[in-house]
Amino acid sequence: MMKKLAGSLVRILIAVLVCPTPLWCAETSPPAPSPTASFADPNLEAAVRKFVIEKRDGDKPLTEADLVNLSTIQGVGLGITNLAGLEKCQNLAALDLSKNKIIDLRPLKTLTKIQSLSLADNQIEDLSPLAEINALQYLELSRNRVKHIQALRSLTNLASLYLSHNQITDISAVVKLPCLASLYLDHNQIRAIPGINGLTGLFTLSFNDNAIADLSPLEGLPGLYTLMLENNKIRDLGPLLEMAKKDKEQRFAPFLNVYLAGNPLTSTAKHRQFSALKELGVRINN
């Protein structure tokens, strides 16, 4: 027995001498470094760097690992023209790149976690890359070159939508967005608003500086608090009066503010209809 034990100890000693580091303590290879992030536009890279805390004040290269954890980026008025590279920010929830020179939104296509997107004052025409960003709740696209908004039809979580100062004529793509509470379409080329009464959750609706004459599609919007219709082609306020009369429970009429300056209202609208609306609690600003 002692001979066997001694033999075993000798074998163990030889193994230790040959391989002094136990297998369970063997060194592992370090993880491969994260690929360097690449931006086509140095102005965009500078904006992103400000939100990478460890590298905001240095010149170490940004890596893809740095980008994947970013939730917010803001780069207002920096002369940004190209968004390439931003597609690596897969967990981005809020992005504000207003007042730049952006045209192409394709790098945003896969950023499906964005909830707040501000791109006002750019040169954007094509909204199709936004069609699958279903998490969007706030979208600001005022003062661009947008003509068609069909791509927004699928953004069913949108609560606030700003599209003023564009070239929009057809609003049919947004009249069935179930969560929409604020809609701004000032300074466009809108002549008709069919289906707008489908947006039953609207609190604020702004159509200033368009070419709207018929207000009958507004009937059926019980939650409106602010209705802006300045500088259109409205002559008759009958539909508004009917809306207020039907509000027997006084749920919205006493809280409704209507802005009508700059419309060719008839004498009847200015006197009888104004008076009737005011008696029902509607505040007229003309």
Task: Go through each PLM region and give its residues.
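Short hydrophobic transmembrane-like helices used for membrane targeting/insertion
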Residues: 2, 10-14, 18, 102, ...
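N-terminal capping/linker segments that flank leucine-rich repeat
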Residues: 3-9, 13-94, 107, 112, ...
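Leucine-rich repeat
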Residues: 67, 88-92, 108-114, 130-136, ...
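Conserved hydrophobic beta-strand positions in leucine-rich repeat
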Residues: 71-73, 95-97, 117-119, 139-141, ...
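Canonical position 11/12 of the leucine-rich repeat
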Residues: 78-81, 101-103, 123-125, 145-147, ...
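Canonical leucine-rich repeat
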Residues: 83-86, 105-108, 127-130, 149-152, ...
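A generic tandem-repeat structural signature
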Residues: 98-99, 103-147, 155, 160-165
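Eukaryotic tandem repeat interaction scaffolds
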Residues: 159-220
